[in-house]
UniProtKB/Swiss-Prot annotation:
Domain of life, source organism: Bacteria
NCBIfam families named among the record's database cross-references: L11_bact
The name this protein goes by in its record: Large ribosomal subunit protein uL11
Quaternary structure and partners: Part of the ribosomal stalk of the 50S ribosomal subunit. Interacts with L10 and the large rRNA to form the base of the stalk. L10 forms an elongated spine to which L12 dimers bind in a sequential fashion forming a multimeric L10(L12)X complex.
PROSITE patterns: RIBOSOMAL_L11
Gene transcribed to yield this protein: rplK
GO biological process per UniProt: translation
Family: Belongs to the universal ribosomal protein uL11 family.
Pfam families per record: Ribosomal_L11 (PF00298), Ribosomal_L11_N (PF03946)
InterPro entries in the cross-refs: Ribosomal_uL11, Ribosomal_uL11_bac-typ, Ribosomal_uL11_C, Ribosomal_uL11_C_sf, Ribosomal_uL11_CS, Ribosomal_uL11_N, Ribosomal_uL11_N_sf
Length: 143
């Protein structure tokens, strides 16, 4: 028989830097999950990723105080800002343009994000990422 699920916890944690301090500790503590066990497993799973990039994670908590977790890909906005060399997006995205991306840079982001997007093919994924970039005030050339 399957384990009884008592809840899901969604967090964004920097790759390789999970520790018991907030937000990880309180979120797992409320469900009485082993915080250090999660931190060690998360850091081991993200050690090949670029340190410090935020990684969304969905933790499934079970009634027997065990857990499983699924790593998602880094948010598109973070990847767009990184490739465009920005610290933040535009306050008025359709008025003030703060950076530029080429089609090849957008393709690179789309390849990374493809598994988490609902796009049917690569071209649709590229258009999705280009739309996210435009909504941040970043111009996209060739899309």
């Amino acid at each position: 028989m399957a384990k009884k699920i008592i809840g899901y916890i969604k967090l964004q944690i920097p790759a390789g830097k999970a520790n018991p301090s907030p937000p990880v500790g309180p979120a797992l503590g409320q469900r009485q999950l082993n915080i250090m066990e999660f931190c060690k497993a998360f850091n081991a799973a993200t050690q090949k990723m670029e340190p410090g990039l935020p990684v969304p994670v969905v933790i499934t908590a079970y009634a027997d105080k065990s857990f499983t977790f699924v790593l998602k890909t880094t948010p598109a906005s973070v990847l767009i800002k990184k490739l465009a060399g920005l610290s933040k997006g535009s306050a008025q995205p359709h008025v003030d343009k703060v950076g530029k991306l080429t089609r090849s840079q957008v393709e690179e982001i789309a390849k990374i994000k493809m598994e988490d997007l609902t796009a049917a093919d690569m071209d649709a994924a590229i258009r999705t990422i280009a739309g996210s970039a435009r909504s941040m005030g970043v111009e996209v050339e060739g899309v």
